[in-house]
Amino acid sequence: GAKKINAIVTKIKRIEDQKEQYKLDSRDLLKWIAIKTEEMGKRNFSNSLEGVQNDFKGFQVFSFSEKPPKAKEHTMLQVTFFEIEMKLKELRQPPFVPPEGQRISDIEQAWRSLEKEEHLKNTALKMEILRQQKLEQLAAQFNQKIGLRNGYLDEMILVLSDSRYGSNLSNVEASFKKHQAISADILSRENRFKDIEKKMGYFEDENYHGKGGIKKSGEGVLSKWKHLLELLSKHQQKLELDTEMLAHLRDIDTVHNSVISLQTSFDSEEFQKAANIEQSMQKLNLYESEIKAIQDSIKRLKSQGKQFSSVKGPISENIEKNVNKLEEDYKQLSSVAKTTREKFEE
């Protein structure tokens, strides 16, 4: 009898040792699961393609090296628990109740939570790798476009900065048409430069690791674009002004031709030696009304010409010179008309 009791006591002691081991092992495993579940829930990935690929390698070390031995521990805990249960049943002892939170169902639930977080992290890492790959592709395309835009801008700035550009005064109309064609070509590209601004914003929003370089090169191009538009506007204004001044010069010439034509009429033998004084007076009245109209035209031309007085250059010099000559010839014509009337009225 004593031998049998000793055997039972020994068995119970072994079971108690197993229970203690279960408590220790389950506590350690649950602690590891809690730490790893928290780690799996974090999304503090590196902000570059290479960095996030290394993050993924680190994650795979967890999945394929660190986790499998713990999965084995998890299985062994289940085996130990059922062994204890069987032995207690054999000895007709009450069932084993692990401490609160350390039951098989608790461990199972914690393990499932860990695997769920692991799956979510795996998906998130793969998505982040794809996002970083896309950003790298877009950055390469952006830099290629920056190169093209820079080439175009440098070329056009060179063209518009040339001192000979639009300076063909013998044919301002041709220069203006050429400028309009160049202007249309430049302005048709405006959306390409708006797109650069949009892309810069995109890289900023996506927190691309190279956004600083993108911003610097993008701003460089946009600054050149602004400079090109300023040059374009400056030439546009100058050519418009040249066109206006040439039209004004043509108006002066037209009035001047009228003065010369009238001068010729006064000098003509037909007028000077007219037999019929009445007929000559009629012609003189007509000429005088024309002279009055010329006087009004000169006033108008001088008033319009004031806007060009501050402009430097050969066209404005010609305007001043031609107006002076026109006034001089007009005074002479007026004097001839006055003398002629006095002669006729004697």
Where is each model-derived feature located?
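Extended alpha-helical coiled-coil rod segments
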Residues: 1-346
